[in-house]
Amino acid sequence: MQLFDVDLFSSAGVPEMPANVVRGPEKTLRELATEGFAVPTLNVMHSDTRMENPVIHCYNQSQMQQMQAYAKAAGIELKVWVAKPGLSNDYLVSLVGGRIIASVGSNAKCQQMTKADPLKRVKKAILRDVAARLGRKCTDDDIVSLIGTRFDESVQRERKMSERGESAFEAVNLAADAGGHDWVLSPIAEMTTMDVFSYIGQVIAGRIECYDRFNQLVEIYRDMNGGDCMVNVYLAGKQSERPACGHRTGCWSCTRVSRDSSAESMIAKEGGEYDWLKPLNDLRNYIKARHFDPSARCWLARTIDKETGTIKIAPNSYSPAFTKELLGIMLTIQLDEFDAAQQAGIKPRFTLLDIQQLLAVEALWGRYGYQKPFTAMRVFLEVYEQGVRYEIPDIAALPKYTEADLRYPEVEVPFCDDQYQGMFNGLRSISHAAADAEFLTTTRSGMVVMDVVTSSGFEIDREGAELFVNFELDNALSRVTFDQSPTAGLHYLMGLGTIAIYKGDHGDWDRMMRMSNQIFRSDLQPILHDRAALIARLGGSSLGQIDLF
């Protein structure tokens, strides 16, 4: 009898996750082991977006420990894999760094960045691990993934599951149409929400053996629903037609829904148990409130017409001023949490941006010409050492913005000057060249650029980041001044080897740094949020909103 290695996706803090684990592989594997079969390793794969509701994040950590302890006692070989986004897919870094905007409505880019891509990467690592243990080359056909999706979750989920052909009884190849292999089994696909809650109740009552009793899970769901028992909430019909991300716990930063009712219920709990979550919810609401604000957007596109040297004026990522404000707010919230945790004698319950993420924001600001050199580090010092606070404005006092406020015709204007293609205008540092301290390479397009450190993705070396902040930062702030281009700070960090770019991505960094330097020479940074000012500065002409009709 051939047994596949089992790869289990675990959901983030929903009942489907424990039900899937217990009903599916662990009990079956234990029975097979008792009958003398060689039992494959159970690989539990968990997704950590780095933005989960902190209460759920803490709960998930304890659940993974419980699973490991249960598996060890049952004689089951179990490995837990945690899929986290790298800096290239880090949602907060990309948002504050000026690379993306928040996902709203049906936009699911956040899910692709923080869950889908990291899970694919970890699944490949599992495949390599399986191959090493079996001593032979393995393919995707050697792994079956068990996932906790259910037809009853929502109308949208039922439609997507049906389109994929998911089944509770037979593994299906989701990649068959593309000629690939992605075998998936959905053990609880046919379970209703009441079935899940009933199952959890049986475990709590001790009638079903499980790796956990789920008492804490019930408490969390009760707090999410304003003190109501989760079963009563369902019977009352409050969740019968919930949309995606509705009454679930998810990312504290999620702006795909109008309001985070789960977090609000937790914050409103008597006794103030979850008061510390309010700043995160307030920040989430502020980002959503400013999303369609024209002054919170950068109006300069990121692609230049190579033949004409022109560029389009259209709403892009968030503006330099707004992203700087967001960084200050996040660091203020984070410092408040660190101080509160120290006073309470506990570990901080969340961290928004660590030192690697902070330097990644610094690098992106230099790449996009968003701020003067080392502005992110200066904001960090303001908050952490100088007592400066960035408070969230009163959202009720803000105008109500909609997508229509960004609806202007695209305008193409001159952008590149005669220095744009200069030797040291992109990914080359004149300071390093003058000191004979640069190593060069050639891009696929024939450009000669600095041969900086490369890796499997955009990365900030942790040890290098800590050494930079502790020993080199003061020197960097004195040597790299505000009258230099934003790329000066980027060159500084690249020269230290603190930043690693994706291998083969030299050309793209060279292109964006040329644009960054052009923004600096044209003095566009202060007006990147102002569409009319950009058009006037760059010499284009424009139609106003009224001319659209």
Describe the role of every protein-language-model region:
Residues 1-549:
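Nucleotide-activated chemistry modules centered on ATP-dependent adenylation/adenylyltransferase
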